[in-house]
A protein has these predicted regions:
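Amphipathic alpha-helical packing segments from all-alpha helical-bundle domains
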Residues: 65-70, 109-136, 143-144, 178-182
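Amphipathic alpha-helical segments used for helix-helix packing
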Residues: 92-114, 160-167
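Basic, helix-initiating cap at the start of DNA-binding domains
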Residues: 1-22, 26-35, 52-55, 67
Length: 208
């Protein structure tokens, strides 16, 4: 690994550590440089400044902004969707900085956040377009389902930090989250079943 790449990783890791321990409010060039053990001039040289550094960090952390469209298997759309939403749960539950990012976004509106939202929106729309194409469903239907599921996951993970139970489900334990995942899987299976029935019905009408 080149020295520049190593230094960039150290700086990004320093940002991650500061957010995890102190929150976004503590981020500053001097604090980051000290945490990374590098000259603050390298932050300007490699990232252009604090705002660009934060923007790059945010874009690297967000789950849906970085989900690869190739993760969707046209031969097993249901399985692909289940894996994607399960991975969202795993990442959010295991990454304190990602949870802090979610909370920060709810109370902040600046250029960095807008860039993140734009990137997430573009990628999300591409994912929805792919699922719509594979299932022959209208994109608005896919978008509604994806929005409900992804937003529900984010809310439950975040509320679980403050409240241990939601509708009798333990949000602070693996058993409770397996219960949530089973519910998500059921919704996806029922939707795919409906899609298949509608598709088969249309085919039968054409062949009658």
């Amino acid at each position: 690994m080149k020295d520049r790449e190593l230094t960039q990783q150290k700086i990004l890791q320093a940002v991650d550590n500061i957010i995890a321990n102190d929150g976004f409010e503590r981020l500053g060039v001097n604090v980051i440089a000290q945490k990374a053990g590098v000259s603050k001039m390298l932050i300007y040289r490699y990232f252009g400044g604090l705002d660009d550094l934060i923007a790059q960090y945010l874009l690297s952390k967000d789950y849906w902004a970085n989900t690869d469209i190739r993760a969707i298997d046209g031969a097993d759309v249901a399985g692909s969707l289940k894996r994607m939403f399960r991975e969202q749960i795993i990442q959010l539950r295991n990454d304190v900085t990602l949870r802090r990012l979610c909370r920060w976004e709810l109370t902040t509106d600046n250029e960095n956040i807008r860039q993140l939202r734009d990137r997430r929106e573009r990628n999300g729309c591409e994912l929805i377009k792919a699922v719509s194409g594979f299932t022959h469903s209208h994109h608005t239907e896919v978008a509604a389902l994806a929005t409900i599921l992804s937003a529900s996951i984010s809310y439950l993970v975040l509320i679980g930090e403050q409240s241990s139970t939601y509708n009798g489900i333990n949000l602070q334990g693996d058993e409770g989250w397996e219960q949530v995942i089973k519910g998500l899987d059921l919704m996806i299976d029922l939707w795919i079943k409906q899609v298949d029935e509608l598709t088969n019905g249309q085919v039968n009408q054409l062949t009658d």
